[in-house]
């Protein structure tokens, strides 16, 4: 026994002596938790442990994804060398060969079909520096108007609503630190317990302090279990529910008349409209009983402080922007904004969902959240870039609309960075066919994803452990992620790939950067004076202070913890309310005899986005090895579906097969399927192509479907 103990302690001593520690930041959700990877070398093997590091946002917490993130970074299928497709097979080539091949094909396409025959498709998982550089690359190196990114499918509705209501879009109007002290919270369409687990303690502390929590979700989730009141609206009726809440608040005088008079436009029009509505009709449309609507409205309206949080559940609709605006109508009409423990939070999905939409990846945007159609904004950014403003392209189209442009033959070449559009987009078969139609397609990725399989060239990118640069997290806090390890093989930093490609295209003078910090220095200048002003933020400050909330206009500025304390960002300083009709401009799919159920989609805790990274992590993949269909047992019985049996789900656009999972807590008319899988299990094959007319968000959360047991289908 003594000998065994000695052997154990000597082994542990050896592990400690061989330890290397790498500080990093999680590559997944918008919390951007700080972490430390511990590498222990034991003889010829290496073992890794990840621990959380204290920081202002996650306070040292990690979830299961963060603890296992390193597994995909060290996966044997990581891309380490450039690949070119020859006779249908990928062949390893040198960087010089790959870049020259891209140059020849890009130049040929533009010579034959014009500058806008090339398009760029970006990502909200890359750093601010890379997002900024990608927007500049599209407009300066390629001179194309066609650039958009996968954040269009994630945050566009909330961003549009905040910009229109407040004049500025920062994920949170106040810091996370205020959540525990608010008196009432509305969680609309957000499952933070599974999607952003490390944010949950803020809400748990609020509950401990006596806050009343109202959850709005057609499903019962780990998040709704925290709530004092759970409203289960029919999928797609959240805007109508918000009208009901607002009607009660106005009728029972829970609005802040002084705040409205001094700081709000449009209230009278909204008041007139909602007072004309019938609560009985609202109940019939939403499926939420009048007494529960009234209970929620009275509680939120009567409390001295309150916050509203939205996420994809209310945003991923063809009226997602207007739906969020209606929840913001509630917020501003009750005066719960710009004050202590009051405000709005858009629970950003992707790691850099906030920063990636601020600095030029969006079709209509320039750095600093400037508009590409505004001449003053164009002149300023062109001056920073050293080009003629007339050479800047005008606005392009959204991510999904670029797929339509490919089908129409206008776009013939694509540069794709760190995204998987044939899995993440709606009407996925149409998107896959678009990618196949491209004359030339370049993908930058960690792995040969489902989309990258179709590429002519794949360039190996850097993972979070090798990458360097800033990320802007869920509350609008800019943080610095230092590089921990060198890139494996011949893989390069994403920003280096962009600079190398610009060089072979003859644009080196605009992309002569030698570090991410140099890029950030230019980004600071380009954002200066914009609504998303990063000028006062430096790498030195981020290292010392652990992160800064923008806007931060000067290097001696402490950052902005709470927005709109005295004024909103519109020219007149007022917030803008707007009437949100019960009937949406773009009709949503309605149930019928052939398609009698609503399909809604979402995440599970162990996976992220299209699963390209998490499906390469054994510890995460094992938790959910396949998608599932959550269905109420009574509904399952109606369609002869057994628990844990294979089921065919079919919409007007296609079908998939998944395994059933009975749930007593989901609505009888609704099924839920997570979206992290591809090919025959890609649930987005079933989703409509219709887009929100304001922000171009697809309607992922409402599709009319039918279900049947696979055994019947096969026979």
Question: How should these model regions be labeled?
Answer:
Residues 1-252, 263, 270, 276, ...:
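N-terminal export/assembly segments and adjacent metallocofactor-ligating motifs
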Residues 192-201, 420-430, 469-472:
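Glycine/threonine-rich flexible loop motifs
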Residues 219-222, 446-482:
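Flexible glycine/proline-rich, aromatic-decorated loop/lid segments
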């Amino acid at each position: 026994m003594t000998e065994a103990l000695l052997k154990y302690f000597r082994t542990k001593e050896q592990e400690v002596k061989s330890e290397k520690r790498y500080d990093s930041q999680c590559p997944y959700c918008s919390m951007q938790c700080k972490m430390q990877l511990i590498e222990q070398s034991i003889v010829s093997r290496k073992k890794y442990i990840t621990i959380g590091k204290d920081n202002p946002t996650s306070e040292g917490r990690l979830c299961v994804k963060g603890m296992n993130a390193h597994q995909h970074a060290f996966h044997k299928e990581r891309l380490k060398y450039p690949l070119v497709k020859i006779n249908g097979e990928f062949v390893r080539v040198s960087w010089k060969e790959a870049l020259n091949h891209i140059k020849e094909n890009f130049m040929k396409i533009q010579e034959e079909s014009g500058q806008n025959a090339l398009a760029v498709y970006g990502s909200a998982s890359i750093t601010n520096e890379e997002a900024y550089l990608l927007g500049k690359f599209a407009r300066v190196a390629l001179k194309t108007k066609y650039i958009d990114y996968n954040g269009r499918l994630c945050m566009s509705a909330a961003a549009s609503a905040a910009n229109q209501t407040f004049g500025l879009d920062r994920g949170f109007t106040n810091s996370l630190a205020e959540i525990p002290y608010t008196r009432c919270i509305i969680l609309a369409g957000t499952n933070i317990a599974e999607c952003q687990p490390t944010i949950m303690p803020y809400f748990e502390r609020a509950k401990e302090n006596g806050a009343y929590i109202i959850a709005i979700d057609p499903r019962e989730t780990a998040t709704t279990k925290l709530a004092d009141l759970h409203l289960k609206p029919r999928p797609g009726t959240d805007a109508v529910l918000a009208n009901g809440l607002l009607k009660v608040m106005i009728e029972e005088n829970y609005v802040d008349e002084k705040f409205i008079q001094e700081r709000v436009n449009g209230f009278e029009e909204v008041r007139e409209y909602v007072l004309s509505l019938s609560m009985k009709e609202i109940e019939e449309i939403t499926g939420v009983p009048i007494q529960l609507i009234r209970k929620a409205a009275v509680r939120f309206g009567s409390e001295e402080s309150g916050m509203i949080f939205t996420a994809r559940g209310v945003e991923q609709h063809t009226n997602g922007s207007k739906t969020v605006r209606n929840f913001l109508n509630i917020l501003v009409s009750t005066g719960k904004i710009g004050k202590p423990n009051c405000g709005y939070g858009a629970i950003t999905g992707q790691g850099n969902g906030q920063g990636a939409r601020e600095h030029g990846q969006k079709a209509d945007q320039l750095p600093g959240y400037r508009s590409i159609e505004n001449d003053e904004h164009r002149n300023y950014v062109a001056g920073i870039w050293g080009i003629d403003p007339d050479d800047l392209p005008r606005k392009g189209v959204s991510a999904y609309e670029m797929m339509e442009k490919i089908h129409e033959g206008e776009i013939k070449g694509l540069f794709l960075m760190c995204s998987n559009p044939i899995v993440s987009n709606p009407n996925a078969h149409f998107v896959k066919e678009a990618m196949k139609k491209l004359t030339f397609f370049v993908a930058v990725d960690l792995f040969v994803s489902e989309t990258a399989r179709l590429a002519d060239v794949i360039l190996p990118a850097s993972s979070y452990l090798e990458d360097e640069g800033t990320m802007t997290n869920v509350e609008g806090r800019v943080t610095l992620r230092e590089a921990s390890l060198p890139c494996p093989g011949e893989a390069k930093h994403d920003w280096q790939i962009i600079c190398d490609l610009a060089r072979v295209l003859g644009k080196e003078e605009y992309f002569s950067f030698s570090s991410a910090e140099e890029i950030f220095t230019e980004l600071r200048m380009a954002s200066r004076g914009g609504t998303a002003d990063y000028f006062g933020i430096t790498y030195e400050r981020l290292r010392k202070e652990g992160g800064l909330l923008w806007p931060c206009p000067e290097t001696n500025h402490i950052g902005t913890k709470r927005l709109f304390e005295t004024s909103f960002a519109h020219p007149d300083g007022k917030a803008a309310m707007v009437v949100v009709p019960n009937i949406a401009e773009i009709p949503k799919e309605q149930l019928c005899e052939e398609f009698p159920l609503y399909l809604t989609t979402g995440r599970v805790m162990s996976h992220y986005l299209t699963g390209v990274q998490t499906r390469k992590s054994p510890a995460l993949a094992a938790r959910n090895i396949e998608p599932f269909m959550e269905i109420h047992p009574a509904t399952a019985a109606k369609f002869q579906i057994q628990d844990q049996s294979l089921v065919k789900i079919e919409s007007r656009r296609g079908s998939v097969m998944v395994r059933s999972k009975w749930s007593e807590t989901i609505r009888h008319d609704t099924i839920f399927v997570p979206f992290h899988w591809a090919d025959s299990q890609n649930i987005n094959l079933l989703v409509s192509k219709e887009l929100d007319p304001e922000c171009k968000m697809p309607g992922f959360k409402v599709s009319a479907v039918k279900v049947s047991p696979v055994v019947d289908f096969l026979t």
